[in-house]
Design a protein with these regions (language model features):
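Short beta->alpha linker loops
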Residues: 33, 61-62, 86, 107-109, ...
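Internal alpha/beta domain cores that form substrate/cofactor-binding pockets in large enzymes
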Residues: 57, 79-82, 94-98, 111-130
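Conserved ATP-dependent adenylate/AMP-binding module captured primarily in the ANL superfamily
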Residues: 51, 86-115, 134-137
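Adenylate-forming
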Residues: 10-13, 34, 38, 45, ...
C-alpha cells in the first residue's frame, strides 16, 4: 500500500468542516484545508525531480508545521522527523543513516542540521510561512 493511500485513509471518514489542527495562537486548519494542503505538497514534491522512493528529513519544532509537513511529505515519499535539539554529531549520524535527498527546516533557521546537510550534499528546503495563513500552512 502506498504512503499516499495510507495518509488518505486517515481522512476518509472525517467531517471536512471540523478542525484537524489547531495551535496555541488559536489558528485552525479544517480537514478540508488539510486535505488540500497535503495534495498540494505531494504535487509540489513530484514536480521537483524527487522520487516517491526518496527520503526527506524534517527538522522542525513540535507544532502545526511539523504535523502538516510530515503528513504532506509522507503522502508522497518517506519522511523522517528528527529532533531539532540534536547536536551536529547526532545529525551527522542520522543523516548518513537515512540518506535523505532533502532536509526540511524553518526559514532563517540556524539549526546545526543545516551545516551537516551542506557537508553531506543534501538539498535544504526552508519552509516559507505567511502571516495571513493558519499556523502549519506554508510554501
Amino acid at each position: 500500500m502506498s504512503s499516499k493511500r495510507i495518509v488518505k485513509n486517515i481522512f476518509e471518514n472525517t467531517d471536512n468542516d471540523k478542525v484537524a489542527i489547531s495551535s496555541e495562537s488559536n489558528s485552525k486548519i479544517s480537514f478540508k484545508d488539510l486535505k488540500t494542503f497535503i495534495e498540494d505538497i505531494s504535487k509540489q514534491l513530484s514536480g521537483t525531480g524527487l522520487s516517491n522512493k526518496d527520503r526527506a528529513a524534517i527538522v522542525l519544532p513540535n507544532g502545526p508545521a511539523m504535523a502538516t509537513s510530515f503528513l504532506g511529505i509522507s503522502s508522497y515519499m518517506s519522511a523522517a522527523p528528527l529532533n531539532p535539539s540534536y547536536k551536529s554529531e547526532e545529525y551527522e549520524f542520522y543523516l548518513k543513516d537515512l540518506n535523505p535527498k532533502i532536509i526540511i527546516v524553518e526559514k532563517n533557521s540556524n539549526n546545526p542540521s543545516i551545516e551537516v546537510a551542506k557537508k553531506l550534499n543534501i538539498e535544504i528546503c526552508e519552509l516559507k510561512t505567511h502571516k495571513d495563513q493558519p499556523d502549519g500552512l506554508f510554501d
